[in-house]
């Protein structure tokens, strides 16, 4: 008879090969199952899932499929014509006091709630997810450093914490810190003349995870310290993962030697979620917050609230709270009324400078590159997008817009606007549609923070 290990491998192999199971579904959900041979019988297969969320999700979505696979394929001791499947949450393993202390000592600001299991994967973030999982699972860095970048609220911090949590499960030493906290800690140790302690804390870890790396810019002493921290970690094959709101070359004021090191390994962009992924996120947030919404309300949130995941979750909670306060039934009309203020387009009234900055960041260009006519495709597209958003959101006349982009022929403005509109409305280019949402998100952020372009130069 097969060993228990072989039985588990055989079952998972059959699941992975099944045409009804995508690779993403297998990696995200079904690969997490552990076969329980002690409870299993000839007509019942018992499995453990690592947490309640996965247990519920796999049972609901894949329970029938697992039953079908095991009934059709005689695996191990399952010989009945019809095999039932039971999935339970795995019992927690007890560790001795000393190992528990060491485990906690390695945990620096890693949020337990952010895991790979509850990260919603779609076409917008699949590459980032696969890279992050490979990094977390590897004993030696497969890429070093790793830098993920993209707009606010797209899941970058979630994926960073997921890496940290997975590493902690393997009893690795993990340091997760924002660049602002790194600065605060640096200044405190510097003031106390205790830099040896600072270096020991940040240079003697297996995983160094830095959030908001763009805030290192313009702080020479901090950049110097981070430069040496980076070098020592890299030289000792310790994994470095960085999160930023823009690509390294677009972090203005960051030393060139740091930009160069940020690009040593692999850089990946987190794109705004498509509608299908947004709907999956809304459903997951409802489940996590134990809020029940009608399908049409969840679809409405996915369609009309921005791509920012935190705003989507806020919309869900706002609907629930208002329904409870008014003792009302949650329906589409209630959702529209409650969420009216969240749907206001903050991009209205944008300055030309903010539009230029948002487009530049989204296409990894410098603002100065866009203001000059060029035959390079990405620059030409950027100039068209500036015109498109300027026509939508600013009262600037064609003449001032032409001057802003150094266009001699004012009629070019209409042609550039029509070109983008055609790509969006007729061709429905997925890339341009996604890019439009990203630029709008960046404009919303710039306008909400009242960030002036001139003050950022």
Curated annotation (Swiss-Prot):
Gene3D superfamilies per UniProt: 1.10.1750.10, 1.10.8.60, 3.30.300.180, P-loop containing nucleotide triphosphate hydrolases
Principal place of residence: cytoplasm
Region (Domain IV, binds dsDNA): 324-457
UniProt keyword Nucleotide-binding, yes or no: yes
Gene Ontology biological-process entries: DNA replication initiation; regulation of DNA replication
Molecular function terms from GO: ATP binding; ATP hydrolysis activity; DNA replication origin binding; lipid binding
Species annotation: Helicobacter pylori (strain J99 / ATCC 700824)
Family to which the UniProt record says this protein belongs: Belongs to the DnaA family.
Region (Domain III, AAA+ region): 109-323
Subcellular location: Cytoplasm
Official protein name in the record: Chromosomal replication initiator protein DnaA
Domain remark in the UniProt entry: Domain I is involved in oligomerization and binding regulators, domain II is flexibile and of varying length in different bacteria, domain III forms the AAA+ region, while domain IV binds dsDNA.
Subunit-structure text: Oligomerizes as a right-handed, spiral filament on DNA at oriC.
Pfam family, one: Bac_DnaA
Function in brief: Plays an essential role in the initiation and regulation of chromosomal replication. ATP-DnaA binds to the origin of replication (oriC) to initiate formation of the DNA replication initiation complex once per cell cycle. Binds the DnaA box (a 9 base pair repeat at the origin) and separates the double-stranded (ds)DNA. Forms a right-handed helical filament on oriC DNA; dsDNA binds to the exterior of the filament while single-stranded (ss)DNA is stabiized in the filament's interior.
GO cellular component terms given for this protein: cytoplasm; plasma membrane
Region (Domain I, interacts with DnaA modulators) location: 1-77
Annotated residues for binding of ATP: 153, 155-157
Keywords, in A-Z order: ATP-binding, Cytoplasm, DNA replication, DNA-binding, Lipid-binding, Nucleotide-binding
Region (Domain II) residue spans: 77-108
